[in-house]
């Protein structure tokens, strides 16, 4: 027997009749209940086809990240919604009784135990036999809606490193295999001495953590392959390091050109790589590690071709962790600095400690918006709410997961051609200087494509504006269960209430008015 999986279904049984429907408890336990029939998301069940004619059963309430399963406690009779996975308790067979109803069994407890309800408490359980509570009627309800696509933001002019569309004639596309070469140079005024190039590379890349972070944050869509040419040793640039000023485009380009000239095409062909990392000794007069972007024909020269995308690693990379390089590579993919150039950097960034592009000292992930902008977040995991709604409910799943709705986007200005939006997602834990992870709850922020890099294009709306030496600025920004975020942006207001936590997911109510 097959079902139309494009619809959601109501499940009622013969014992309790059509006035009671299978539902989910709202207490965070993920347990089931029989509740008075109504238009509730916990009573909208989705059937997801699996192999052998079996189905996973999920609700609109908790979404695709939670599937009907059985608690493995020895008795194995209690159904609940568990994190979706390849588990035998989530493979359900719907067998016709011959009277228009169905028996629901699963692979874990076998064909002898069917979904039933107790005669006294009416709680669902699994039992043997042929009882009226095991005769389930599936009534088709609404067609399952898709997520509304999130539009690109319109910068409204020439905005450098905008949160709007990325110009891939200028930046690297963050997908597929992106190849990078790392070379090492020193200077008459800053010799490398006995510094190991190989050990330096290990530190800069975090012994492979930088590459792994990009692979995980992109859900496997980006593979950053770094070829470390420590075997070529430290090559001496003729000019002193003080002759270069990396904050100036022409001087920055000259430095990369002079460094690349030290390597013959037979040693390394820079044209084979999309990105180039040029490493200087700690003693060089480069306090920072800026990214270099150039349009075709305006890049640095090399014996084997033009270099348009590079990171020149300075002394801060020796004291900072590998996130420093991850941040700079983010610029090569078109992501902006979220902290203000006129402020104190990460210490007072309006995006707080919640993004690698804001705080390299505590953040270990990219915002959901940047995952979306980079094309990493699947379209089904983000949705756009363009119209006013006094009560819109959703269960948000962690961005680090592989399923579920993870990003809500709401326009602040023109809903059809927005330049500024509100974003709602689950906070991704930061790493404290004490080595401990911190941060859970719901994060709310604005994204403005008309604001350039270094001018706070992302602003977190915090529960509490506080700072910690261990966890960073705005470390108490996320909202927890029972807490309410409220903001007014121009003519738009958003009130977001965190209703409940289910595992690592949060159920929220959105009141959006424009």
Question: Where do the language-model regions lie?
Answer:
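Zn2+-dependent metallopeptidase catalytic core
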Residues: 145-318, 326, 343, 413, ...
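Structured loops at beta-to-helix junctions and adjacent beta-edge loops in soluble globular domains
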Residues: 14, 60, 107, 183-188, ...
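Residue-level detector of buried hydrophobic side-chain packing
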Residues: 22, 66-68, 115, 182, ...
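Lectin-like carbohydrate-binding module/patch detector with strong preference for beta-trefoil
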Residues: 1-145
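Short Gly/aromatic-enriched secondary-structure transition segments
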Residues: 34-35, 195-207, 436-443
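Extracellular hydrolytic enzyme modules, especially secreted metalloproteases
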Residues: 270, 274-277, 282-434
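Residues that flank catalytic or metal-binding motifs in active/ligand-binding sites
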Residues: 7, 18, 41-43, 64, ...
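Non-catalytic C-terminal accessory/binding modules of secreted extracellular proteins
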Residues: 143-163, 193-194, 293-318, 390-514
